[in-house]
From Swiss-Prot:
It comes from Bacillus cereus (strain AH187). This is Trigger factor. PROSITE patterns: FKBP_PPIASE (PS50059). GO terms for biological process: 'de novo' cotranslational protein folding; cell division; chaperone-mediated protein folding; protein transport; protein unfolding. GO terms for cellular component: cytoplasm. It catalyses: [protein]-peptidylproline (omega=180) = [protein]-peptidylproline (omega=0).
Amino acid sequence: MAAKWEKLEGNVGVLTIEVDAKEVNNSIDAAFKKVVKTINVPGFRKGKMPRPLFEQRFGVESLYQDALDIILPKAYGEAIDEAGIFPVAHPEIDIEKFEKNANLIFTAKVTVKPEVKLGEYKGLAVEKVETTVTDEDVENELKSLQERQAELVVKEEGTVENGDTAVIDFEGFVDGEAFEGGKGENYSLAIGSGTFIPGFEEQLIGLKSGESKDVEVSFPEEYHAAELAGKPATFKVTVHEIKTKELPELNDEFAKEADEAVATLDELKAKLRTNLEEGKKHEAEHKVRDEVVELAAANAEIDIPEAMIDTELDRMVREFEQRLSQQGMNLELYYQFTGTDADKLKEQMKEDAQKRVRINLVLEAIIEAENIEVTEEEVTAEVEKMAEMYGMPVDAIKQALGSVDALAEDLKVRKAVDFLVENAA
C-alpha cells in the first residue's frame, strides 16, 4: 500500500491511497464468502453456490461494494498512520479505480486536527477568591436546615400568604372554552414557588379556606403548547385548605435530629462551619482552575474546523439526553415543553461546544509543550481511588474502563491544569 498526503487550504487535505491488487482480490474473496451464505440456488445447499456460477449469474461486480466495505477501513487506517495525520471527522471517499486483478486507487478528503499556536499560559493573573466563613453564613445554613425540616400544618384561620401551601381545585378557560391539561383537584400549590403561570399564585394571596376566585392571567409567549402561547386565560379556583410551615425550635434536640454525629446545637454549628469552609475552599480552587484554563485558551491562536464543533455538539446532545432520561424525560418531550427542536438546541449549545473544543486543543498543546507524562503507578493509584469511591473491587473498575488509555489521558489533562495553576501569578 502507498499513501500520499497533500495539504489543502485550512485544516483540510487529501490522501491518495493505492492498494495492491492482491489485497483487492482478497477482499473480493472475503465478500463472496459473506454474500454466498445468503443465497439459495436450486441444486445446491444454502451457501454452497460455486464461485464460477455466482460470477456467471451475478457478475463479479456485484461483490465490489461488500469488498470495498472490507478493504477501505483497513487501507484508510493504515494511510493516516503512514501520513501521521489526525482526522477529526469522517473522510469524503472517492473511488478512482476498483476492479478485480488491479490496484485499488482512492482519495480521502480529510479534515485534520488544527495547529495550535500557544499564547501566554505561564504567569497568568487570576483573582483570588475569598474563602472566609462568617457567622452569618453559618446562621443562613442553619436556617436552611431548619426550613428543610419544617412541617406543613393546617392553618385553621387566616388567609393565604406567600410561603403557604394552598390546596386548590382549578379549571382554566381560553376564549370561554376549557382546555386540555387545565384542570386539577386537591392540588397542593406552594405560593411563591413559581410553579404556575406568572401572576397566578400572587392572586391567591388573601383568600380564605372555602373561598373561590376567577384568576386572570396570560400564557407566556414562549409557552410549550403553541395553541395557548400568548393567550389570556381565566382560571376558576377554589381554596380548600391552607397549610403553613411550622419550623422546629433550634435547640440540642433539633441538632441531634439533623445530624446523628452531633449532640448539641453548638456542635452542629461547628460542623456546618467546617463544611462551609471546605465547600468554599473547593469552590475557590475550581474557580481558579477554570479561570487559568480559559485565559490560556483565549491567548491561543486556533482555526477550529467546523467538523470538530459538530462532533462536540453531538456529544453534548447525547449527554443532555442522558440527563433527561435520569429525570424520566426524553428529547421529544423536552422539545414539546420548551417549544424548541434539535437545531435550536444545538444553536443554544454551540458557544459552549466551541469553548470546549478550544480548551481541549489548548490543553493537549500544553501537554506536548511541557512534556507532561503519566506513570503506570499514577494510573494504578487512580484506579484504586475510583474503586474506593464506588465501593467496587479494583478488577471490576478495570473491567468497566476496558482500557486505561482514556484514564491516562484524563490524568494528563489534570496535570496540565495543575501546571497552569502552579505557574499562575
